[in-house]
Amino acid sequence: MIISSSSDYREAARRRLPPFLFHYIDGGAYAEATLRRNVEDLSDLALRQRVLKSVGEVDLSTTLLKQQLSMPVGLAPVGLTGMYARRGEVQAAQAATQKGIPFTLSTVSVCSIEEVQSQVGKPIWFQLYVLKDRGFMKNALERAWAAGIRTLVFTVDMPVPGARYRDAHSGMSGPNAAFRRMVQAVLHPFWAYDVGLMGTPHDLGNVSAYRKEKTSLEDYVGWLGNNFDPSIGWKDLEWIREFWKGPMVIKGILDPEDARDAVRFGADGIIVSNHGGRQLDGVLSSARAMPAIADAVKGEMTLLADSGIRSGLDVVRMLAQGADGVLLGRAFVYALAAAGRAGVENLLDIIAKEMRVAMTLTGARAISDISRDSLVREIERPLARAAQ
């Protein structure tokens, strides 16, 4: 099929993947209202077109967390990425490194910290959950640092797992899940051979390294669910801040007061995120949450955002809302599932091209030129939708 956008990669991924995997990455929590709003609220932000501004050459480069990047984009941590392509985390990390942007490895990745970092020429980022098993957390931090990783992304919006109804219907969970997944794999032979057969082992590399035993998909759900810690507070994280000597970014902030708490805690940055609409349905989209957070803490830390970003236009919109950079989640996984490393590299080229067009037509020569003045304040469409 013809690929010209991230939506094309989504369709290609849908065709290639067994349903339990496609719907796991594609779905959200409960009725998926926040999942939809993440995309819709960004698209409702009208870019302010300017002409005859002598833009000339557009420069996408920027510096985030003292790292020089080709553009203000990174790849977000996504669990089980290695199930979407053969050794998927490695392929995605190689694509990101080739394009001069960071890749963030999930705690619950298929490929281990050591495997991924050894296959790329620059340090990746590592994401860690707040878990009851402090021994695992300490082990993961020590291994990440020893591997050369210096940027830690600490996810705080998962004290309990979100309810994702699609998973029960797709076969990721629910009655006879293992049998349903097996049947789906048989009906998708290209995936079954490339990933199912040639992409082994399919355990969770970081968890298995700590537990000293293979952690299967079935084990993953139980182990992770039993280890979430809803009792944790900022004071419980102080040992991590003391242990980790590199940049530390808090992921999962939607409220300005939580952003101020992150500043007081000593975080180097935050990620304005609702976990891609996969945790609490009905919360603000990242696009709507960003302006108030930027007003509260802009200049005191690095502001990143994820959730709902599908195009270079969305990147520019989120930067105009106050973000310093963004992370792509679903968009890169769709491309990875469809075409591996080459798909991710092509997606990033598409994103960069779309950014250049948007910046040229809004009169921005450099990332620093993007501001709230790059948007037309439009309220009619969001209000009209709310009234329906």
Curated annotation (Swiss-Prot):
Keywords: Cell inner membrane, Cell membrane, Flavoprotein, FMN, Membrane, Oxidoreductase
GO cellular component: plasma membrane
Keyword Chloroplast carried by entry: no
CDD domains on file: alpha_hydroxyacid_oxid_FMN
Domain of life: Bacteria
List of residues binding substrate: Y24, Y129, R164, R278
Enzyme Commission (EC) number: 1.1.-.-
Ranges of residues in domain FMN hydroxy acid dehydrogenase: 1-380
GO BP term, pick one: aerobic respiration
Membrane topology note: Peripheral membrane protein
Keyword Protein transport: no
Molecular-function GO terms, alphabetical: FMN binding; L-lactate dehydrogenase activity
Active site: H275 (proton acceptor)
Cofactors, names only: FMN
Subcellular location(s) per record: Cell inner membrane
InterPro entries on file: Aldolase_TIM (IPR013785), Alpha-hydoxy_acid_DH_FMN (IPR012133), FMN-dep_DH (IPR000262), FMN_HAD (IPR037396), FMN_hydac_DH_AS (IPR008259), LldD (IPR020920)
Amino acids binding FMN: 106, 127, 155, 251, 306-330
Coiled coil start-end: none
Reaction(s) catalysed (UniProt annotation): (S)-lactate + A = pyruvate + AH2
NCBIfam families to which the protein is assigned, alphabetical: L_lactate_LldD, PRK11197.1
Function of the molecule: Catalyzes the conversion of L-lactate to pyruvate. Is coupled to the respiratory chain.
Family: Belongs to the FMN-dependent alpha-hydroxy acid dehydrogenase family.
HAMAP family, A to Z: L_lact_dehydr
This protein's name: L-lactate dehydrogenase
Organism the protein comes from: Xanthobacter autotrophicus (strain ATCC BAA-1158 / Py2)
